[in-house]
């Protein structure tokens, strides 16, 4: 296919128009070889391990701030109406909550490994909480 010269166009805002040349060439190549090429997929577990390494390195909060703040306000409504929170108080609650959840998931994973499994299940979480003494 002959290449055509691209001319500069005035932008009207929004997304830039995509080039059609590459996709046309790709389609003819795919049909000539006998089908559409499948997208690349990693083996099961590879992406999970990559995410584990990524999140173990990071220190940022994993739960979004506004949904957590809404949850805190919703729970506080049950105890007293018209409560106000300093932003630092919500941040401290979020930090403590995430630390608790990470620890609970670590213990849950140990329970699953003890049962000779790699997949955590609700019964692992129940056992972890029971051993901790949080639930009778």
Curated annotation (Swiss-Prot):
Record flagged with keyword Glycosyltransferase: no
Family annotation (Pfam families): Histone
Keyword Phosphoprotein listed: yes
Residues found modified as N6-methylated lysine: 5, 10, 19, 24, 37
Post-translational modification (record): Acetylation is generally linked to gene activation. Can be acetylated to form H3K9ac, H3K14ac, H3K18ac and H3K23ac. H3K9ac could compete with H3K9me and prevent gene silencing. H3K9ac is restricted to euchromatin. Methylated to form mainly H3K4me, H3K9me, H3K18me, H3K23me and H3K36me. H3K4me1/2/3, H3K9me3 and H3K36me1/2/3 are typical marks for euchromatin, whereas heterochromatic chromocenters are enriched in H3K9me1/2. H2BK143ub1 is probably prerequisite for H3K4me.
Disulfide bridge partners, by residue number: none
Compartmental location: Nucleus; Chromosome
Residue numbers of Phosphoserine PTMs: 11
PROSITE patterns according to UniProt: HISTONE_H3_1, HISTONE_H3_2
SUPFAM superfamilies, sorted: Histone-fold
Entry's Gene Ontology molecular function annotations: DNA binding; protein heterodimerization activity; structural constituent of chromatin
Residue numbers carrying N6-acetyllysine: 10, 15, 19, 24
Positions of post-translational Phosphothreonine modification: 12
One GO term describing the cellular component: nucleosome
InterPro entries registered for this protein in UniProt: Histone-fold, Histone_H2A/H2B/H3, Histone_H3/CENP-A
Region described as Disordered: 1-20
Keywords: Acetylation, Chromosome, DNA-binding, Methylation, Nucleosome core, Nucleus, Phosphoprotein
Chief place where the protein resides: nucleus
Family indicated by similarity: Belongs to the histone H3 family.
Quaternary structure note: The nucleosome is a histone octamer containing two molecules each of H2A, H2B, H3 and H4 assembled in one H3-H4 heterotetramer and two H2A-H2B heterodimers. The octamer wraps approximately 147 bp of DNA.
Function: Core component of nucleosome. Nucleosomes wrap and compact DNA into chromatin, limiting DNA accessibility to the cellular machineries which require DNA as a template. Histones thereby play a central role in transcription regulation, DNA repair, DNA replication and chromosomal stability. DNA accessibility is regulated via a complex set of post-translational modifications of histones, also called histone code, and nucleosome remodeling.
Protein name (Swiss-Prot/TrEMBL): Histone H3.2
